[in-house]
Each structure stands twice: as C-alpha cells, then as structure tokens.
Swiss-Prot record:
Localization (cell): Secreted
GO cellular component entries: extracellular space
Signal peptide annotation: 1-21
Glycosylation sites: 87
Name of the molecule in the record: Secretoglobin family 1D member
This protein's UniProt keywords: Glycoprotein, Secreted, Signal
Keyword Lipoprotein listed: no
Lineage of producing organism: Eukaryota, Metazoa, Chordata, Craniata, Vertebrata
Length: 102
C-alpha cells in the first residue's frame, strides 16, 4: 500500500508543477509497462533512458515489490493514475488555450 501512495504522490508532483506542460505520453506508457511487463521486458524498456545501472537496479527492486500486487489491485492503481494523468492533461490544455484564467 505504501508504494501505491508513493506512485500517486510522484504522479501528482509531475502533473501539478509550475510549467503547466502536458503530461508526456511516454510517462503514461512507462507506468503501464511498470505494472504489467515482466521484469526482463521492463528492463529492456528502461534502456531507452540510458539510466545509470544503480538507477535501473533501484527501479527493478521497486518493480519486484509491485509485482506482488494482485492483478485487481494493479488495475485499481493504474485506473486511478490514468484519471490523474487525464485530469492533468485537460487542466494543462485549458491553461495553454486560455492563459488569463490561470
């Protein structure tokens, strides 16, 4: 449960920072891969970021914890994160289209 709260807080921090940028589709795809890809495929997916080995190892360690979540709980978490990402994107697009309302 603590990990899902952490993931939620990270997502909120990324969505509601001052720049008002639209949420990167790669971030949304990475969240899905994190929760549903097997370890080997996810490790290959992380290669696109050219992250240091220590960062990849840390991410994989967290993934091993989330892999123990039931499929039902993973669906609940990704559904909530999807709603947050959608809300962030809609809010950011409104700010871009009408800056005086921000």
């Amino acid at each position: 449960m603590r990990l899902s709260v952490t993931a939620l807080l990270v997502t909120l921090a990324l969505c509601y920072y001052e720049a008002n940028a639209i949420v990167c589709p790669t971030f949304a795809a990475d969240l899905t891969e994190f929760f549903y890809f097997p370890d080997l495929l996810y490790r290959l997916s992380l290669a696109k970021y050219n992250a240091p080995p220590e960062a990849v190892a840390a991410k994989m360690e967290v993934k091993q914890c989330t892999d123990r979540f039931s499929v039902k709980n993973r669906l609940i978490i990704t559904n909530i994160l999807g709603k947050i990402l959608l809300n962030c994107t809609v809010t950011d697009v409104k700010a871009v289209l009408n800056p005086s309302s921000a």
